[in-house]
Every structure is written in structure tokens, then in C-alpha cells.
From Swiss-Prot:
PANTHER family tied to this protein: ADENINE PHOSPHORIBOSYLTRANSFERASE, URACIL PHOSPHORIBOSYLTRANSFERASE, CHLOROPLASTIC
NCBIfam families in UniProt: PRK00129.1, upp
Originating gene: upp
Record field: transmembrane: none
Activity control note: Allosterically activated by GTP.
Protein name: Uracil phosphoribosyltransferase
GO biological process, one term: uracil salvage
Binding annotation for uracil: 193, 198-200
A GO molecular-function descriptor: uracil phosphoribosyltransferase activity
Co-factor remark: Binds 1 Mg(2+) ion per subunit. The magnesium is bound as Mg-PRPP.
Catalytic activity: UMP + diphosphate = 5-phospho-alpha-D-ribose 1-diphosphate + uracil
Enzyme Commission no: 2.4.2.9
UniProt organism field: Acholeplasma laidlawii (strain PG-8A)
Biological role: Catalyzes the conversion of uracil and 5-phospho-alpha-D-ribose 1-diphosphate (PRPP) to UMP and diphosphate.
Length: 208
């Protein structure tokens, strides 16, 4: 079963309160989502492998460490875009791919309509980013697509999840760790996380 990490940090909790508030403006919501993405990055990267390199300081040569593998951020369009800048600010060397999904009207399952990834997904560490882990369908479909393209080290990064989404993702991809800022109570009858924060995409981009 895949590892589930729900971050417990006062700054993250403070910022989560801001984005849960229905009265928070689009601008503040978007900025805060990025800030939470940056804070989460410390947790999701703490076990990454490093290698020794030699650098020359103004005083003398010394041995330092740098990341061994390329980091690749893959947001699920469109809401996943809101977290990209925060993560990228922490790891500017990270490359960015994109995947877009739509829901098939008959099967109700997500289908990929757009996928563009750096070749580094083959040997790099891939972060699949989506603010909400609700049914788990989109996350599962995105990770399946990445694995079909050769990705081996994949992690899911979200803001809010629920037990239903976590269970599905762990069943479909038991090798994929899940990192969340919060684990909420449940899904309601129309598929929204409760208490959640509403539609993350609409709140990020000011749409209805």
C-alpha cells in the first residue's frame, strides 16, 4: 500500500484556512496555493538521493551535495497549474510536463486529451500535482499515463484529499506515495470533498 503523508505544520494549517474561506479573493487564493506548494516541497523532497560534487568557494575548494535525479513536475490541467510555481521556486532546476484529462460520458472515467512530458521522466523523480484528490480517478489516470511512458519514481502531491480518493489511488498505484496538506472527511453526493475548499480550478482562475 502506498505511503500517505498528511503534513502537520502550523504555516501550512494557517494558509489552508485562507484557501478554505469562501470569501478569499481569487488573487489571494492563487498566491496562497503557490505558497503551500512551496512549503510542501520540503517534505516531498527530503528523501531524494544526492551526490557529492566539488565546488570552489571564495576561500578554497570543498565538497557539497546536489540532487542526483532530475525533478519533473506534472500538473493535471487546469487546477494543478496553481501549485507549480511554488514547487518550481524551491527547485528551479525542475522540468515541467503537462497532462489534460476529460471525463468520458459513458464510462465516467478520465481520458487523456493532452500529454507532454520531458524525457527525464524515465529516470527522474516525477511529481504529479493536483490540488484535490477526490474520487482519485484523475490522479490514477495521470499516473497510469506516465508509467506507460516509462516513469518509475512517481509521487502524488495535493492540497486536500479524502478517504475515497486515497483508497483508490493506493489500490491502483500502491507504489506511489501520496502527500497532502489535509485529509478531509468524505465526498458528498456530487463528488465534492467535504469540507474541502470548493472547485480549486474555478477559484484559481476566477471562473464559474
Amino acid at each position: 500500500m502506498g505511503k500517505l503523508v498528511v503534513l502537520n505544520h502550523p504555516l501550512i494549517d494557517h494558509k489552508m484556512a485562507l484557501i478554505r474561506d469562501k470569501n478569499t479573493s481569487t488573487k489571494t487564493f492563487r498566491e496562497t496555493v503557490g505558497e503551500i506548494g512551496a512549503l510542501i516541497t520540503y517534505e516531498i523532497t527530503k528523501d531524494l538521493e544526492t551526490v557529492e560534487i566539488e565546488v570552489e568557494t571564495p576561500i578554497q575548494k570543498t565538497i557539497c551535495r546536489q540532487l542526483k535525479k532530475q525533478l519533473v513536475i506534472v500538473p493535471i490541467l487546469r487546477a494543478g497549474l496553481g501549485m507549480v510555481n511554488g514547487i518550481h521556486d524551491m527547485v528551479p532546476s525542475a522540468k515541467i510536463g503537462h497532462i489534460g484529462l476529460y471525463r468520458d460520458e459513458k464510462s465516467l472515467e478520465p481520458v487523456s486529451y493532452y500529454a507532454k512530458f520531458p524525457t527525464d521522466i524515465l529516470d527522474g523523480v516525477v511529481l504529479v500535482v493536483d490540488p484535490m484528490l477526490a474520487t482519485g480517478g484523475s490522479a490514477t489516470a495521470a499516473i497510469t499515463e506516465l508509467k506507460n511512458r516509462g516513469a518509475k519514481d512517481v509521487r502524488f502531491v495535493g492540497l486536500v484529499g479524502c478517504p475515497e480518493g486515497v483508497k483508490r489511488l493506493q489500490m491502483d498505484h500502491p507504489d506511489v506515495p501520496i502527500y497532502l496538506a489535509a485529509l478531509d472527511e468524505k465526498l458528498n453526493e456530487v463528488g465534492y470533498i467535504v469540507p474541502g475548499l470548493g472547485d480549486a480550478g474555478d477559484r484559481l482562475f476566477g471562473t464559474k
